[in-house]
A protein has these predicted regions:
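Positively charged N-terminal leader segments that act as targeting/secretion signals
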Residues: 1-8, 15-30, 47-52, 66, ...
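Short, positively charged and aromatic/hydrophobic N-terminal segments
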Residues: 29-43, 54, 69-71
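N-terminal membrane-anchoring alpha-helices
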Residues: 63-64, 68-142
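Beta-strand-turn-beta hairpins that frame and shape the catalytic cleft
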Residues: 134-149, 238, 245-258, 283-287, ...
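Membrane-embedded segments
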Residues: 145-231, 235-239
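Active-site neighborhood of phospho(di)ester-bond hydrolases with catalytic His/Asp-centered motifs
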Residues: 151-152, 178-183, 209-215, 241-243, ...
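Binuclear metal-dependent hydrolase catalytic cores centered on His/Asp/Glu-rich metal-binding motifs
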Residues: 224-238, 250-292, 298-300, 363-366
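Conserved beta-sheet core of the metallophosphoesterase superfamily
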Residues: 295-374
Length: 379
């Protein structure tokens, strides 16, 4: 596993996995691929006779007396063939058809192996590494800057025993507040509770931690009837917001955190609409952050309310991200989604950050899509 020192804007050097190291590793691998392919191509040119062939050194042509002697002894045709057989022209070697087919097949197999190896290397890298993505947000009222670490969709993945590597990196980031975007557990896998509780307990020793439930926790809570789920989070030091607000005073600034529950289609059915209407009139805070697990919640409903920063996850970055195209698919938006990872401007002038998340999918592996730990610096 690569561990890199990554420079931050404040001059600190921290031991985290960075996009720079990922790009350097991929660049080295692809250079090896290109060199290998060029070597195969050059060797094939030599085998098929497409390259230069050594010329036969010209010999002295027979004179008239020699020609007459050859005609008298062997006939006219022999003299002509003898003359042309010693010409200085270069002959091309003919390659049998079976050899051409074999070489073409070898090239195809080699190219397929190289592409397959690159894909497998990409998948393996994404299973063991993550990148710290940094975002800079300007606030109108904050008197002193603060740092927020946002992590979401950690299920089906563990970074070191009990996520010790992830916790160590977060500790070195020195956040003022840690926010969770949901899906820390996997529906149907009760054994993942231990990892979730251990991670939350360790995070709560670094900074205040609060967050929302994801769709996996909702299924555990509503479908399996695990009414003690929120209590388990609370016991681990995490405040779970279910259409609720939490406030923190950081560097003499009051930060309001809104946590909206459920999915966009349930906005009017389970109290989210009434909750947002109730807190809309508040003004006694310096910064307001809104949390929702699903990013389309913001574009469909939440951008009609007042806050400066929105945070969401759920999409896993689209799972597969194509070069020059972006995320391939999400359940809410279908193919080529608009909100699957990155920062976006909302209609209320707020910034929406959609994290690619830290976890994995049980069906399709991440391809060209490194997991993300989001670091937001607000000034």
């Amino acid at each position: 596993m690569l561990r890199a020192r990554h420079p931050f804007f404040d001059g600190k050097l921290l031991n985290v996995k960075s996009a720079h190291d990922r790009d350097a590793l991929f660049a080295f691998y692809y250079k090896c691929v290109i060199i290998s392919y060029i070597s195969i191509f050059v060797s094939v040119l030599g085998e098929t006779g497409c390259g230069p062939v050594p010329c036969v050194s010209p010999r002295k042509l027979p004179g008239r007396k020699d020609v007459a002697f050859i005609k008298a002894k062997h006939g006219k045709g022999a003299a002509q063939s003898g003359r042309h057989s010693h010409s200085g022209s270069c002959a091309q070697r003919a390659t049998p058809l079976w050899k051409q087919v074999l070489l073409t097949l070898l090239i195809f197999i080699a190219l397929l192996a190289l592409l397959g190896g690159a894909l497998w290397q990409n998948i393996c890298y994404n299973r063991t590494h993550y990148t710290a993505e940094f975002y800079q947000i300007h606030s109108r009222k904050l008197t002193q800057s603060c740092r927020v670490v946002f992590l979401t969709d950690v299920h089906l993945r563990e970074y070191g025993q009990d996520n010790c590597e992830l916790v160590q990196d977060i500790r070195r980031l020195a956040p003022d507040l840690i926010l969770l975007g949901g899906d820390l557990v996997t529906y149907g896998e009760g054994s993942s509770y231990d990892n979730m509780l251990s991670l939350c307990s360790q995070l709560s020793q670094i900074a205040p931690v609060c967050g929302v439930l994801g769709n996996h926790e909702d299924e555990l809570y509503f479908l399996d009837g695990d009414q003690a789920l929120v209590e388990k989070f609370t016991a681990a030091g995490v405040t779970i917001l279910r259409n609720q607000e939490a406030r923190y005073t950081i560097h003499d600034n009051v930060i309001s955190i809104l946590g909206v529950e459920g999915s966009p289609k349930n906005f009017y059915n389970y109290g989210a609409s009434a909750f947002m209407d109730a807190v809309e009139t508040q003004t006694d805070y310096d910064l307001r952050i809104c949390l929702a697990h699903i990013p389309t919640y913001f574009t469909e409903h939440l951008e009609n309310y007042s806050f400066e920063l929105g945070l969401a996850g759920h999409t896993h970055g689209g799972i597969v991200r194509l070069p020059k195209v972006g995320p391939l698919y999400t359940a809410e938006e279908g193919f080529l989604p608009d909100y699957a990872g990155g920062s976006y401007a909302l209609a209320n002038s707020a910034t929406l950050i959609v994290s690619r998340g830290l976890g994995d999918s049980s069906r399709v592996p991440r391809i060209n899509n490194v997991p993300e730990l989001s670091v937001i610096d607000i000034d």
